């Protein structure tokens, strides 16, 4: 079997408190799947070392086998694939794909979009491992600097707000698709990380999601100003 990143994520197991992935003889990993395991520091073990383990559900019940309609909420817990946090991760997968296409569209975008891509991948890690999102600059800008530029682009780039159209170059269209994907991920994040009263449970993740879509808009502004 050839495992891609989604297959791998669905089959990560917990072994003595650590996340592992069992790979059977003859099975292979795509480069994306191997990068994911390396990035998340998930050890690859031969399938012979796998032993019967029970999967824990959110309601406290246990299962001996993982049902196809369920996946790991974290290294310990299984939940249905329509859980809000799982849906959020799916939106983030789409965003990652769109960001990579932006990098391929123009070499000059490789570095700034790469920073946004790195942040997107960090957010998934912070969700899965319940880690805080570190504060920092994005594409050289603090949150306040980014906010001022996105509100008043004319003052900083000589380019007012605009709506992308068929007359724009392909790079702007690519960036706009990625911006839309970032917005969809942000909306999914609000569903996943707000309690019943609407209070954010992960304001750091929600703040970072907003910064990503805003930064992609600034990159669109910069590209538009070059015309």
Language model segments and positions:
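Membrane-cytosol interface segments
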Residues: 1-53
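Phosphate/pyrophosphate-binding loop motifs in nucleotide- or prenyl diphosphate-using proteins
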Residues: 31, 39-227
């Amino acid at each position: 079997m050839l495992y891609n990143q989604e297959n791998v994520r669905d089959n990560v197991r917990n072994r003595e408190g650590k996340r592992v992935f069992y790979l059977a003889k003859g099975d292979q990993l795509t480069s994306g799947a191997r990068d994911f395991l390396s990035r998340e520091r998930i050890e690859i073990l031969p399938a012979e070392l796998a032993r019967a383990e029970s999967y824990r559900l959110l309601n406290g019940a246990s299962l001996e086998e993982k049902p196809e309609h369920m996946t790991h909420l974290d290294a310990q817990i299984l939940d249905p694939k329509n859980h809000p946090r799982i849906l959020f991760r799916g939106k983030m997968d789409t965003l990652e794909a769109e960001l990579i296409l932006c990098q391929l569209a123009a070499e000059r975008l490789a570095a700034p979009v790469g920073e946004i891509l790195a942040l997107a991948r960090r957010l998934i890690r912070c969700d899965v491992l319940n880690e805080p999102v570190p504060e920092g600059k994005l594409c050289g800008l603090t949150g306040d600097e980014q906010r001022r530029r996105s509100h008043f682009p004319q003052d900083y780039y000589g380019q007012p707000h605009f709506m992308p159209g068929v007359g724009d170059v392909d790079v702007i269209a690519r960036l706009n698709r990625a911006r839309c994907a970032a917005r969809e991920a942000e909306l999914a994040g609000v569903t996943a990380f707000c309690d019943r009263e609407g209070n954010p449970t992960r304001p750091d993740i929600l703040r970072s999601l907003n910064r990503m879509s805003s930064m992609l808009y600034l990159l669109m502004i910069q590209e538009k100003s070059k015309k």
